[in-house]
Amino acid sequence: MDTSHSDTVLIIDFGSQVTQLIARRVRAMGVYSEIVPFQSALGGINRIKPKAVILSGSPYSTLDNGSPRAPIEVFEAGIPVLGICYGQQVMCVQLGGKVEAGHEREFGRAFLEIKEESALFDGVWEKGSSQQVWMSHGDRVTALPEGFCVIGTSKGAPYAAISDEKRNFYAVQFHPEVVHTPDGEKLLQNFVCKISGIKNNWSMAAYRDQAIAAIREKVGKNRVICGLSGGVDSSVTAVLLHEAIGDQLTCIFVDHGLIRKNEAEEVLKLFRDNYNIELIHVNAADMFINALEGETDPEKKRKTIGRLFIEVFEEETKKIGGAKFLAQGTLYPDVIESVSAIGEAITIKSHHNVGGLPERMNMKLVEPLRELFKDDVRSLGRELGLPEEFIKRHPFPGPGLAIRCPGAVTREKIEILREADAIYLDEIRKAGLYDKIWQAFAILLPVQTVGVMGDGRTYEFVCALRAVTSVDGMTADFYPHDMDFLSRTAARIINEVRGINRVVYDITSKPPGTIEWE
């Protein structure tokens, strides 16, 4: 499903881990941005006709044979171009400058000496000042292309910021998109709004209207099936579709018995009572848990759950009959093409819950969120009037509690884990911490320890608690709970949940760990 955007910033991705952050920063200004891999950048330029282009960073070196380049048409289109890190080096190499391996690498915090006034620095940095930026480079520019001048230097980069003001070409060795460059967002805003002259009129209200019109045009009078999990992505998808096509939509909520406490009741109440959406609730807990009983391999757990989900969803869809479209809550990061210096770009489109269903059932896909990041989806949810408790709900994995129960899965262990998890989240909400934490949950370890309760000896499970802060889930830090909170929560779990006699707290960040345990 495509929606049109008149003023777009095109971001050419050379494989940087923070390319998505550039797009999100631009969107936060109220300007639409789109990412394309360097291999298909020329097609993106012809299709999108952008008002400005940003060249991303990269793990590659311009000195390597076959390293990525931008289409030369980028520099011939007569539009503003901003190069960031590797993007700066690519711009210089392609326009006649020179890049060499640096004698002094710069990683982390650095200071930029502002040498000249520039439209990029207007109202942000003054000539002669020293400004904190974030660097991550080994190579550096050593000779400028014709028409360029130096506007900023650093200890390890004599051409840390350069510009050709006549052609509106700007390039920086540092990363303005990361929070560690305190004024980076203002610099990007100067480039997008002042230099490129793009109006910041992209909003969720406008996107909502465009998406509804696009859904109606694509779907017509046909029926649509939507898999509902209760998470923010599927919830926003369902409400947006219902606003567009009303009773043509049927939602299916498959309860696999591995969800959080009271989650099924909360989902049913919201969508049946508040939105009057036709919703089929399938209680398939016995089927899933029986199939998982005794399974210890985390990958087999995921595959078993995925296979059964497809079987249940397929069976329920056949009962409805006549549906031509399957709706998915696919987000923009799921469809952005990954970048490889050699070979074709690879597009990741499958969704862990319904992957393979459209082909098996001869249905067409409708993906109204495929142009949005997670924070865009939350904004759209507010625009649609979804309750905050659903919009701010912590991420929850498709396989549910099965992957928070390392070792063999049993019905008893899932119930123990569900109760412990509910207590932990209850204490987090009481302490006013829920919205400060990206994700929090309990894990039931496949370990039993000796304990003493009353006059008796116990031999019961260990419960681990996990809480992390994050912006996008790509990296995460553990949340520093105070000892009073942990002591209070541990006491409740041990006293109220039969089967647990010890509680520990996970203080691993990502990397090196992952957020989930399996």
Swiss-Prot record:
Every Glutamine amidotransferase type-1 domain range: 8-201
Record-listed ATP binding positions: S229, G230, G231, V232, D233, S234, S235
Active site: C85, H175, E177
One GO CC term on file: cytosol
Keyword Nucleotide-binding among record annotations: yes
A Pfam family that the UniProt record links to this protein: GMP_synt_C
Alphabetized UniProt keyword annotations: ATP-binding, Glutamine amidotransferase, GMP biosynthesis, Ligase, Nucleotide-binding, Purine biosynthesis
Pathway annotation from the record: Purine metabolism; GMP biosynthesis; GMP from XMP (L-Gln route): step 1/1
Keyword Nucleotide-binding: yes
EC number, as in UniProt: 6.3.5.2
Entry-linked SUPFAM superfamilies: Adenine nucleotide alpha hydrolases-like (SSF52402), Class I glutamine amidotransferase-like (SSF52317), GMP synthetase C-terminal dimerisation domain (SSF54810)
Domain GMPS ATP-PPase residues, every copy: 202-393
Catalytic reactions of this protein: XMP + L-glutamine + ATP + H2O = GMP + L-glutamate + AMP + diphosphate + 2 H(+)
HAMAP family documented for this protein: GMP_synthase (MF_00344)
Subunit structure: Homodimer.
NCBIfam families noted in UniProt: guaA_Cterm (TIGR00884), guaA_Nterm (TIGR00888), PRK00074.1 (NF000848)
Role noted for this protein: Catalyzes the synthesis of GMP from XMP.
UniProt-recorded name of the protein: GMP synthase [glutamine-hydrolyzing]
Source species of the chain: Bartonella bacilliformis (strain ATCC 35685 / KC583 / Herrer 020/F12,63)
Organism lineage string: Bacteria, Pseudomonadati, Pseudomonadota, Alphaproteobacteria, Hyphomicrobiales
